[in-house]
Amino acid sequence: MQEIFLCSISNVRSGDCKEDCAYCTQSSHHQGAIKRYKFKDEKVVLQEARALRELGALGFCLVTSGRELDDEKCEYIAKLAKAINQEELGLHLIACCGRADLDQLEFLRDAGIHSYNHNLETSQNFFPKICSTHTWEERFITCENALRAGLGLCSGGIFGLNESWEDRIEMLRALASLSPHTTPINFFIKNPVLPIDAETLSADEALECVLLAKEFLPNARLMAAGGREVVFKDNDKKEAKLFEYGINAVVLGDYLTTKGKAPKKDIERLLSYGLKMAASCH
């Protein structure tokens, strides 16, 4: 029976990002109707961690909006990591805080963070079409820094941004050179406040993307992330194929600014596919 790893997200700092990423509603350039706050209260984050662990989540990702880590964010994430680890929940803690240098990542590692998430998003060639305020190369360097710091690397991308199949191949080839332990696979969902005018991928094309990712990243944990709930909707037959084609992890619950599937119903559906929820990250 195939094991599926469940990971959950806490958006601990939301909105007001100065970057102009064309796919992200947290950018202040797009004026999306989202909640904006600086730092989520520690008690709320702990409640989320307990509740999601009880549902079976093994990974818990602390996400901050903004271009990069700074001293204030480092201290805040370190404080959250220590508090969560003191609960002895057995959660694998991931930080996702933008561009980061080696010293910052070593600081988070020593505070109890286990992995760092920083997505390449797309190919080096296509990236300037979706962001002008930082470079693809900066993203790649941060991924290298995470590995140098001894953290697990979680890095993936978004399919459906109007990129070509060659762009998809180039992104996956770059990811393969990093050997991430986990690769989130996101499917872009059109939003009227965002400048990208792209139709949602069909379930069949999304499955082709998963097959391609598996070909380039045979040893990575492929995680179905944003967009799964829209691309596959209630199409159980095609959603089940995700796991036949290489997906072995999913994001449980909500994303950064969009609703995911209801966790309990999502788990019931996964079980109906003949999948088993993993009991350990190792």
Swiss-Prot record:
Its cofactor is [4Fe-4S] cluster; [2Fe-2S] cluster. It is an enzyme of class 2 (transferase). Its EC number is 2.8.1.6. Pathway: Cofactor biosynthesis; biotin biosynthesis; biotin from 7,8-diaminononanoate: step 2/2. SUPFAM superfamilies: Radical SAM enzymes (SSF102114). Pfam families: BATS, Radical_SAM. [4Fe-4S] cluster binds at C17, C21, C24. GO terms for biological process: biotin biosynthetic process. GO terms for molecular function: 2 iron, 2 sulfur cluster binding; 4 iron, 4 sulfur cluster binding; biotin synthase activity; iron ion binding. Binds 1 [4Fe-4S] cluster. The cluster is coordinated with 3 cysteines and an exchangeable S-adenosyl-L-methionine. Residues 1-228 form the Radical SAM core domain. It catalyses: (4R,5S)-dethiobiotin + (sulfur carrier)-SH + 2 reduced [2Fe-2S]-[ferredoxin] + 2 S-adenosyl-L-methionine = (sulfur carrier)-H + biotin + 2 5'-deoxyadenosine + 2 L-methionine + 2 oxidized [2Fe-2S]-[ferredoxin]. Keywords: 2Fe-2S, 4Fe-4S, Biotin biosynthesis, Iron, Iron-sulfur, Metal-binding, S-adenosyl-L-methionine, Transferase. [2Fe-2S] cluster binds at C61, C96, C154, R221. Catalyzes the conversion of dethiobiotin (DTB) to biotin by the insertion of a sulfur atom into dethiobiotin via a radical-based mechanism. HAMAP family: BioB. Belongs to the radical SAM superfamily. Biotin synthase family. Homodimer. NCBIfam families: bioB, PRK08508.1. This is Biotin synthase.
